[in-house]
Amino acid sequence: MLTTTSVGSTTHEPLRLMAIHAHPDDESSKGAATMAKYVQEGVQVMVVSCTGGERGDVLNAAAQELVDQLGIHEVRQREMAEAAHILGVQHEWLGFMDSGFTEGEPLPEDAFALVPLEVSVPPLVKLIREFRPQVVTTYDENGGYPHPDHIQTHVITMAAIQAAADPHAHPELGPSHVVQKVYYNQQFHKARVVALHELLVAQKIESPYVE
C-alpha cells in the first residue's frame, strides 16, 4: 500500500483519493480509469455521489424494460454498486435529489441545486473528516458542462474542503482534516476525444466523433 509522510511527522498515512460526483454514472465517465489505476497501485479511493440520478434519461434502449420494472432509482443504485465493485472503490451517497437538466425551465423544489449550503455541506464535511483524503477530484466552477447538479457539486465540494480543515467549523463532525490537493475533471478536451475516436475506429465501432 502506498503511504505518505506528513511534514514534521514520522507517521506514514495510507494514500487516499476522494472523487466527488453529481450522479451515479459520472464516476464511470469521468475519471474511472484514473481511479482504477490508483486502486491497483494501493491507493484507497472513495466515490461520493451527491444525488441518486433520479431524473436522468435512459439513453440505452435495452435498459428501458428494467427501468420500467424497477424504477430508475433502483436501477441506478444497482449500476453504482456494480461500478464500485468493478473499480474497487468505496462508495457513499449524500442522498440529495437529482435536479434534472431543465434547460431553462424552473428547477423542481426538491432539487439538489436548490438545497441551502448549510444543509448540503455538512454531510460532505463529515465524509472528508472520516475518510481523510490527501487528494479530492471534482468538477470546475462550470461543472464540466452546465448541469445544475455538476455546478452545485463544485460549490459544496470547495465549501466542504474549507470547512473540513477548520477545527472550529462543525466540531461535532470529527477532527479537522486538510485536503492537500484538488483536481478538476477535464474530460472534454481534444486529446481525449481523438483517443476515443481512434479506439472506436480500430475496433470497427461507429464513432460519434467523426466530425
Regions inferred by a protein language model and the residue ranges of each:
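Solvent-exposed loop/turn segments at secondary-structure junctions
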Residues: 24, 54-55, 98-100, 143-144, ...
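Acidic/histidine-rich helix-loop elements
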Residues: 56-74, 100-103, 107-113
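A short helix->loop->beta-strand "cap" motif at the edges of active sites that frequently abuts
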Residues: 42-44, 89, 177-180
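ATP-dependent adenylation/pyrophosphate-handling site
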Residues: 13-71
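Metal-dependent de-N-acetylase/amidase catalytic core
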Residues: 1-20, 104-211
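Short, surface-exposed alpha-helical segments at coil->helix boundaries
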Residues: 73-77, 81, 154
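A conserved beta-strand->alpha-helix junction
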Residues: 49-51, 84-102
